[in-house]
Every structure is written in C-alpha cells, then in structure tokens.
Swiss-Prot record:
Pfam families: Thioredoxin. This is Thioredoxin-related transmembrane protein 2. It comes from Bos taurus (Bovine). Its main location: endoplasmic reticulum. Residues 132-269 form the Thioredoxin domain. The gene is TMX2.
Length: 296
C-alpha cells in the first residue's frame, strides 16, 4: 500500500501535473531532478563518461549508481506516507532527486558535481514555486487591520491562518484552506490569512514563531468574541510545535467546523435578534491537560 497509494495519486493527477510542467518552476525542477539520468543515458554525452561496469558500457548505470537510486526510491516512499496533497508528493520527489543527483555527479566527476550544485543554487535564487491562485473566500489581513476586523463584530467567528510565502508547508496547505473557506464561509463564520513573514509584529503579538526550527508555520487560530479560543499546532514547553497534520479532515474535526457552520447560519438568519454576548460555538476555551498529553 505504501507504494500503490503514491502511484494512484500520481496517475489520478496527471492532468494537473501537465499544467504544472507548463510553468517554469516545475519544468526546470523536473529537468534538474532527471539531469543525471539524461547525462548517463543520452548519447553522445554518455559515451565520454567514466564507468565501473565490467562490460565497460558508459551509457548504463553501474551497481553503485543503482544502489543510490534504489535508496532514493525508498526515502521518497517513506516521506510520501505523511504527504497529503499531490504538491507535497511532487515536492518530496524533486527535493530528494536533486540530492541524489548531486551525489551521483560528484561520484562521477567533481567538476560535474560543482556545476550541478551551482545550477541548483541559481535555480533556488531565481525561481520560486507559484502561489495558489484558485478560488477562495478568504480575507487577507495586514498588521493594522487584523485587530480591527476581529473586534468589529464579536458575534462573528474567525479562523485565521498565520503563514509565510517561503514555507513549503504553507504552500501545500493553501489549496486545502481555500477549499475549506469555499465550503464553510458564511455570515457568522469567516476565514482570514495574515502573512507573518511580512508583518513580523503580528507574529510577535500572536506568539507565532517564524523560525523554521519551531515548525509553527502554518498556524490556525480560532477567534470568538475577538479572543483566541484554540490553535493548531499546539506549542510545547520548548516552544516547538507539537506534530499535527494539516489535512482537511483534521481541521474539520479539531475546529468543529460543521457545528460552527450550523450555528453561524442560525446567527445569520436571526440577524440582530441575537445579542452579541451569545456564544457562537461550543468549542472549549482551553485545551485540557489530558488532551495536550495525548496529542504530544
């Protein structure tokens, strides 16, 4: 199953992959990932390469290169078991393929290895992964508007994502969060986002660390009555995020989105008859110690 699941997901997403390859970032990344395969297999380039094969064929893999490629396949399958979206699957394949390519090129010729590393550095500096541009019902906050919007109508429940464009986890979660906003956004339940990579004072104010070591990005916070009710991922005593998978099912379950949505619809139907002090959702204001220990 560990092998079949990624293959089925890959085949199912062939149309989307074809659109990706039309973009410079994915096309160049795929080209770099397959660089050693192309150099080793395509004549006349491969004919001048050194080889350790007994038959002396320079256009075929030797046993050590096969071992490295098999090890790469095992690592990719292990990493993809925790991947949720196709973007995460493809990202893992690209990343570990480039590492394997660098090892193979350095083993072949140190000059080719240095050239490949240089190309990868230039690629990272000049090409950025495309941001999600699909449909969504999400309001984007700045450092000046987030507090004002949360306090404007305390009957409205807000789910706010704290993200940074450089974070691959945030990029992978973007289509999931957008899909949730399309399904659950209504008058009494709104979705928002704030770029803490750009507005650093917001990250300090809401205690969301932007350091890659803490793994706190993305962070989802539920606000009711203008105050924080819960957040995912939770933070341990060392300031590191407790491991939590940002899947659509987990967000719906942990944040009680179905219940929040039903209560928000009742709020929109009742209008001004409902006083502001009435709670919008029955989500506990604090996470019990037992749950925190269980999550950890």
């Amino acid at each position: 199953m560990a092998v079949l699941a990624p293959l089925i997901a890959l085949v199912y997403s062939v149309p989307r992959l074809s659109r990706w390859l039309a973009r410079p970032y994915y096309f160049l990344s795929a080209l770099l990932s397959a660089a050693f395969l192309l150099v080793r297999k395509l004549p006349p380039v491969c004919e001048s390469l050194p080889t350790q094969r007994e038959d002396g064929n320079p256009c075929d893999f030797d046993w050590r290169e096969v071992e490295i490629l098999m090890f790469l396949s095992a690592i990719v399958m292990m990493k993809n078991r925790r991947s949720i979206t196709v973007e995460q699957h493809v990202g893992n394949i690209f990343m570990f393929s480039k590492v394997a390519n660098a090892i193979l090129f350095f083993r072949l010729d140190i000059r080719m290895g240095l050239l490949y590393i240089t190309l990868c550095i230039v690629f990272l500096m000049t090409c950025k992964p495309p941001l999600y541009m699909g449909p969504e019902y999400i309001k984007y906050f700045s450092d000046k508007t987030i507090d004002e919007e949360l306090e404007r109508d305390k009957r409205v429940t807000w789910i706010v994502e704290f993200f940074a464009n450089w974070s691959s986890d945030c990029q992978s979660f973007a289509p999931i969060y957008a899909d949730l906003s399309l399904k659950y956004n209504c008058t009494g339940l709104n979705f928002g986002k704030v770029d803490v990579g750009r507005y650093t004072d917001v990250s300090t104010r809401y205690k969301v660390s932007t350091s890659p070591l803490t793994k706190q990005l993305p962070t989802l916070i539920l606000f009711q009555g203008g105050k924080e009710v819960m957040r995912r991922p939770q933070i341990d005593k060392k300031g590191r995020a407790v491991s939590w998978t940002f899947s659509e099912e987990n967000v719906i379950r942990e944040f009680n989105l179905n219940e929040l949505y039903q209560r928000a619809k009742k709020l929109s139907k009742a209008g001004d008859k409902i006083p502001e002090e009435q709670p919008v959702a029955a989500v506990p204001a604090a996470v019990p110690d037992e749950e925190s220990k269980k999550d950890k």
